[in-house]
Every structure is written in structure tokens, then in C-alpha cells.
């Protein structure tokens, strides 16, 4: 059911009226590992994209959106508007990504 929750970065959903339920979020934190760190160290010398980190951040974004949808579903929402991402490092070797927005319920 959570995968059916509409998530949009816009404030309005064209053609839909809704009531605001409240703030909703999904968060994940992942740690780097020795193999990623070794590869990143080599890439920092020669330059270029660090694909292992890009993959980790993409996975983190996907997980945070899935958790946002689950949270919204548990609140009885049909959609999330004004979705945004925020991210940051924790203790230098962990990356946290949060997806947040406003849970809404459609009015017929």
C-alpha cells in the first residue's frame, strides 16, 4: 500500500483537493566500508566519479523515500507534497539521508 503513495516536490497536485495531515519523513544512515574507502582514496588521486559512493547515496535516497511512503501510509495519507532531501555525514564514516514533506489526504 505504501508504494501507492504519490510523492511530489510541488506544493499542489493539479486537479486534486486535499487536507493536510502533517509532517512526514523517512531516514536512513549507511556506513562506508574499507573497500569503498580504498577505491575512494585511489579516485581522489586520479580524479573522477567515485561510483561506490554514488551507488551508496542512490540506495540511501531510495530507502528514505520508501520509508517516507510507509510513514505517510501509516498516517492515512494518499500523497506527500513538498518532498525534499537533506543529507549529512556522521562521525566522518557514515552518511545520513532524510526525505521529508507534508502528508496529505485527498478530499473527494
From Swiss-Prot:
<comment type="similarity">
    <text>Belongs to the UPF0145 family.</text>
</comment>
<dbReference type="InterPro" id="IPR002765">
    <property type="entry name" value="UPF0145_YbjQ-like"/>
</dbReference>
<dbReference type="Pfam" id="PF01906">
    <property type="entry name" value="YbjQ_1"/>
</dbReference>
<protein>
    <recommendedName>
        <fullName>UPF0145 protein LJ_1287</fullName>
    </recommendedName>
</protein>
<dbReference type="InterPro" id="IPR035439">
    <property type="entry name" value="UPF0145_dom_sf"/>
</dbReference>
